[in-house]
Amino acid sequence: MWALRGCRSGSRWGQGAALLLLLLGVPPRGLALPPLRYSHAGICPNDMNPNLWVDAQSTCKRECETDQECETYEKCCPNVCGTKSCVAARYMDVKGKKGPVGMPKEATCDHFMCLQQGSECDIWDGQPVCKCRDRCEKEPSFTCASDGLTYYNRCYMDAEACSKGITLAVVTCRYHFTWPNTSPSPPETTVHPTTAPPETPGLDATAPALLNHPAHQSVTVGETVSFLCDVVGRPRPEITWEKQLEDRENVVMRPNHVRGNVVVTNIAQLVIYNAQPQDAGIYTCTARNAAGVLRADFPLSVVSGGQASATAESSPNGTALPAAECLKPPDSDDCGEEQTRWYFDAQANNCLTFTFGHCHRNRNHFETYEACMLACMSGSLAMCSLPALQGPCKAYVPRWAYNSQTGQCQSFVYGGCEGNGNNFESREDCEESCPFPRGNQRCRACKPRQKLVTSFCRSDFVILGRISELTEEPDSGRALVTVDEVLKDEKMGLKFLGQEPLEVTLLHMDWTCPCPNVTVGEAPLIIMGEVDGGMAVLRPDSFVGASSTRRARKLREVMHKKTCDVLKDFPGLQ
């Protein structure tokens, strides 16, 4: 009993009046009442049995703070996402022991059907009712569903369908077998076998290639997102996933691997449940076999509901930042609330995540990956850094792509559609275009006016050499070239130069995005230019590329066979 102050001791009338006021909801003067707390009947499943933890994926989306936010037959209970969710309540038996209430004799679920997928019959207030399941087994049995997601097991899929009031079906998990066939057909096969891709002579092994573009995804906090690294190759590539972490070693995840809310399924699909801001970042798929290795980056942005709408409204009007801002290091100092943001990393040629402390010392910080790319990568992504992309079509055309991991051009099979810029008809074309020096990554790749042979024929001089000194001037520049070999010289008499370096004038240079992109170093270059007033001159579209034994041999063959004379007689061939 509460102590009733202000009433005469021993007065039954005073106590009765105070009790009446209390029952009417009017506390007597001087009476201290405890705060009222709204609560539904029953207990949470995890209070009844630790093994009944609320663990269905769908329950994490029905977040709550108190029972008042839930249905009358539900409780607000902790879930595996670290928050609370509305779930069906449990009850104590008549002896006070925790456990489900025994069904009254007059209530039964025997002839009561629940039509919604993922629902089950339960007795509520003496009547059978349908409710969504709030308990799933812990053992993984990855299930591919018709909504395009892979669930931890069948129960998780049913719970998702019930929470949304929809129907989800189990579908065959997508898996693309290697091409060509990894083993010969057995003798007992039919006389007319099914159509298979044609065999390509000499391609006993093919390096991994992607079937689809690695797309950026942006989700709201609490949603589920998945990435499929759809690759082919011979032999079958092994796939691993890792997240690019800030100042920490990356954790490699293989198929059938669970780490927190991140799962890699048995078909190597990466699934992130209940996405949180710290889950944003670059998720890298690595596919490896005996013929080569492929790495593809899948960016993920995780934003709140308000940020998502604001980003959708502002992204079309995004403006590029000055190059100097994009090249500044991320501002990681702590000046207040910490958030996960994106910044442009010139060395990685990509946007990465970091912990932003709101110091605002520079502008190289963005809410989403897309906003970062719009601001600091307004030009096309350097094609030589793109992964080999086969595409969904079935033309099966041999092509070449530059592999930034090995630093070499490798063959792959192109399907004929939806490829990318890292796609060349021959190894020679690939080596002519890749790699190119990485400078300001907002700049497009420098492209010469003509290809190797045509540029050779139309140039006044062609030399093999190294840049020993470079001087920048407004709209121009000067380079000192140590000449290793003179392949062509029509106007300067370079054979009399001896050991002296050749001074080359660079015309119409934009030093924020220099073309040709020459740098001081020991790497041998093929330099083709013009002669103007006795001076060696390079223009933005002049041919300057990495020298190789193959290229040098080809240019010597052009001289020996007098190919340039033939091209002069037939201009249409150039």
Curated annotation (Swiss-Prot):
Which Gene Ontology MF annotations are present? Answer: receptor antagonist activity; serine-type endopeptidase inhibitor activity; transforming growth factor beta binding
Q: Which SUPFAM superfamilies match?
A: BPTI-like (SSF57362), Elafin-like (SSF57256), Immunoglobulin (SSF48726), Kazal-type serine protease inhibitors (SSF100895), TIMP-like (SSF50242)
Q: Which CDD domains match?
A: IgI_3_WFIKKN-like (cd05765), KAZAL_FS (cd00104), Kunitz_WFIKKN_1-like (cd22605), Kunitz_WFIKKN_2-like (cd22606), NTR_WFIKKN (cd03575)
Q: Where is the Ig-like C2-type domain?
A: 208-301
Tell me which PANTHER family the record gives: ACP24A4-RELATED (PTHR45938), WAP, KAZAL, IMMUNOGLOBULIN, KUNITZ AND NTR DOMAIN-CONTAINING PROTEIN 2 (PTHR45938:SF7)
| Primary role | Protease-inhibitor that contains multiple distinct protease inhibitor domains. Probably has serine protease- and metalloprotease-inhibitor activity. Inhibits the biological activity of mature myostatin, but not activin.
Assembly, per entry? Interacts with both mature and propeptide myostatin/MSTN.
What is the designated name of this protein?
WAP, Kazal, immunoglobulin, Kunitz and NTR domain-containing protein 2
Q: Which organism is it from?
A: Bos taurus (Bovine)
